């Protein structure tokens, strides 16, 4: 069996400091993310494309878990498939070691680039320059979070001509151990544009909000030195954003101040949220939390009393007021 044709361009990449690993792909097919990307946040990732053998994804991850190198894995995959020259596959382990194979029966232009920390591969491309521009964009944005670097790489590919047939779907998946929503799983970012006339633009639009609604909150929850630069980058990005909602500012402010990190930024964001939604008692509670975390108990009390004035029967606000009064009297 030849399997389905998934001509595409992809990047597999890892951040060896934060321990994030991800894949981004775009193609003129429906739902490129359905078959191409396979990721295990503890071991590595596999991208299987062209005349895709989807078995390579699961088997590749199993072999990574067993400690095989990316080259050894591709050699094993080759030995198991009589139609291997139709395939294109890339493997990257969590340490940034990668390897790729492009069969000589792939539709041109087809090729790959491998280096420490990333594997870039594509087939049915307008030219070799598509891959070169992907690499250039990825390397020139090293100060940004991995997900954003992957998206910028895909955008560069599209600008360089991308898939010769056109565009339809894109996917970006980034995993980090316990980096998913509330730590339930590992999906830090999972954005799928399955059928669109402008998949890159849609991907960027959704990511713009995703990075604050989900990714930054996960970074804050996991908060450690390895993630600090990403947290600072995203907080600064939020400061200059002009179209975020009150909820976005409030959610981040609460996470920061309840964990006693970057409390000054948290206070700034909570006040922005209040300006956007001045009668929201929950935002007033967040402002109080930020003042409390900064040791300004009188202002915390002031904002809690404002919140209670709006929701006069709120027992939570009443208990918080008594708590803050106790701190003032200590």
What label would you give each PLM region?
Residues 226-228, 313-314:
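Charged, low-complexity interaction regions
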Residues 220-225, 235, 239-290:
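Alpha-helical adaptor scaffolds
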Residues 6-223:
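N-terminal nucleophile
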Residues 258-259, 293, 323-327:
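Register position in tetratricopeptide repeats
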